[in-house]
Design a protein with these regions (language model features):
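Catalytic histidine-centered segment of alpha/beta-hydrolase-like enzymes
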Residues: 278-287, 291
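Conserved HGGG/HGGXW glycine-rich cap/lid loop of the alpha/beta-hydrolase fold
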Residues: 33-80
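Residue-level detector of flexible, active-site-proximal loop/helix-junction positions
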Residues: 39, 143, 279
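Short phosphate-engaging motifs
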Residues: 40, 50, 176, 206, ...
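Flexible "cap/lid" subdomain of the alpha/beta-hydrolase fold that forms the substrate-access gate
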Residues: 1-21, 30, 53, 68, ...
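Short polybasic linear motifs
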Residues: 303-314
């Protein structure tokens, strides 16, 4: 049996100087960052990243806001159970996020910062609890079915269809996470940042979530998560009067400019900034531009108080 390797936290501590917090979720340790005090800003990461991706934004906001950044189960510093003991599905991710926010007893309006899969997970949570949401900050993500006639990149299709080969490639050789280090940044990442992003995915057992996220992409109605995505897609207009900031890297092989156009079609009042010098990891490529924009947006939009009620069927 393959032995699980420990994560060398000290190797990236200089870039990620945050205290670790853990919550029990159905017997598994759910890791999160909880820095600062004030109005809560909850940041939700995607695949194959973890809370490390938001480190610069945490450091910028935590002097005035309470920044809460979980690692999904199977990601970052959270436990990485096998697929028999944990259900690596979209709905479970939303349940976990909901459990964390309930456990922290957050009473103030929440700003959701969402990237990649975080858009689906965060928006699903928001539809369960629209009265708890104050603002949205979106970065190269989606929360709707693919735009009309939009093909899924061949890389993702192959991982989904060629399961034995994909398992070997993703869990055995870590090709998805390693490839993301080069493909998802337009400017290129430093050696230290690459090491930090990939550190939690250092052995077969620790890469299961990377594989499961891709396998759960909702391409057809046969996918277990398709119904939940469709429900979000059909109800996004609930947030039409919520303050929304969209920051977009133009060089994204999945969430390209067509996805940005779809967001703008659905939310014409959103504040939008797109960056020709950035890719999918937009916060890595242009943090010096995005962080001041986010700070200004939060200052200018204190949020709205009257919320409609909508509860998602569990």
């Amino acid at each position: 049996m393959l032995k699980r390797k420990p994560i060398d936290i000290e190797s990236f501590r200089h870039l990620y100087p945050f205290e670790s917090h853990f919550m029990d979720v159905n017997g598994f340790k759910y890791h999160y960052v909880d820095e600062g005090s004030g109005e809560p800003v909850v940041m939700v990461h995607g695949n194959p990243t973890w809370s490390f991706y938001y480190r610069a934004l945490i450091q910028s906001l935590s002097d005035r806001y309470r920044t809460i950044v979980p690692d999904h189960i199977g990601c970052g510093l959270s436990d990485k159970p096998d697929g028999k003991t944990y259900d690596y599905k979209f709905k479970t991710r939303v349940d976990d996020l909901e459990a964390l926010i309930e456990n922290l007893e957050i009473k103030e309006k929440i700003t959701l910062v969402l990237h990649d899969w975080g858009g689906f997970i965060g928006m699903a949570y928001a539809l369960r609890h629209p009265e708890r949401i104050g603002r949205f900050v979106l970065m190269n993500t989606a929360a709707f079915l693919p735009p009309a006639n939009k093909p899924i990149p061949m890389t993702l299709k192959l991982i989904r269809r060629l399961k034995p080969l994909a398992t070997l490639a993703v869990q055995g050789f870590n090709l998805f996470a390693r490839g993301a280090l080069f493909k998802n940044s337009y400017k290129g990442l430093s050696k230290d940042v690459k090491a930090g992003l990939i550190a939690p995915y250092n052995c077969w057992q620790n890469r299961i979530a990377t594989l499961k996220f891709v396998q759960d992409i909702h391409l057809t109605q046969n996918n277990p998560s398709y119904g939940l995505v469709k429900k979000i897609d059909q109800n996004l207009e609930l947030f039409s009067n919520y303050p929304m900031l969209i920051c977009w890297g133009e060089h994204d092989f999945v969430f390209d400019m067509d996805y940005l156009a779809e967001w703008q079609h659905r939310f014409p009042e959103a504040e939008v900034h797109h960056f020709p010098e950035a890719g999918h990891y937009v916060l890595e490529d242009v943090p010096d531009k995005i962080i001041p924009i986010v700070n200004r947006f939060l200052d200018q939009h204190p949020g709205i108080e009257d919320r409609g009620q909508m509860t998602e069927d569990r």
